[in-house]
Amino acid sequence: PKMRKFLIALPLILAAPLLAQQDAAPQLPGVADAARVAAGTYAVDSRHSQVNWQVNHFGFNDYFGLFGDIKGTLQIDPANPAAAKVDVTIPISSVATSSQGLTDHLKTADFFDVAKFESARFVSTSAVVDGQKAVIKGDLTMLGVTKPVELETRFEGAGNNPMNKKATIGFHAATTLKRSEWGMTKYVPM
């Protein structure tokens, strides 16, 4: 038992000099500082934006997926962030999971019906800002049905992007949907 404790503590002892030698952490280009937000219209960076999702699989476990190639805009004025406008289009055919069979099934009429509905779209209607967080209300159109949703949003950072040299801002947003409200009723409720 004493040897085990020693072996666990040893990496911590060896790491201490390394930690002590480090200077201040390097400054990232994006910092969660609202003063760095420039007013204007921002285009969604389709290469670095995605919608991640998870769904419970019959009470056994969760599985996960994503949509990529997101397009859209954010209009924002840091002097009046509550007036921000978001308009985002999600190409449904970009749905991806770790299983090709599941991905293919999700594209059928049982779920997203990509042959009939190419995209989903979120358009904001209001924003309530509280520091680094906001509740963004809007309408989500999916499978030809439009319903209101609320996005719990967190400001992540602003600054000049070193890759494209443009002013860039980043956010995370989360919501919970009841898919049957958009007509996706296969295997509901189970």
Identify what each model region corresponds to.
Residues 12-20:
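Hydrophobic h-region of N-terminal signal peptides that target proteins for export
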Residues 9:
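FAD cofactor-binding and catalytic pocket of flavoenzymes
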Residues 21-190:
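Low-complexity, acidic/polar, glycine-enriched regions of mature
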Residues 1-6:
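Positively charged n-region of N-terminal signal peptides that target proteins for export
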